[in-house]
């Protein structure tokens, strides 16, 4: 059974993609960005996370669908949603089947398998940390290799 670790869910997101959106903040991120807004999402298992199956999460999201109107939907953010690729992919697939617009707000630092994820994604908000290798490492503490792999998949 696939499970996902979710930090929190915001039901009235107005700045995380077009329209009125529900924002799902995933738990877990490998980066340690100097300016991170959500450092409490860094660890995958914080002890405070909510655990969902894909079906449970989508059933929760369906309750908000009437508020999305013609141009809203759901945005998956974090943390880094791409780190939970199997869970994310199944949630995206179920959302698309339910007619929910999908968006991923990501730094592009996951575990590969991006083509399948992107096949069920309507919009990607890609956080480009820096344009140089040294600058990227200085800000995130990591190499940009995984980011570049995701960028080529997009």
Q: Where is each model-derived feature located?
A:
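Short hydrophobic interaction/assembly module
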Residues: 44-66
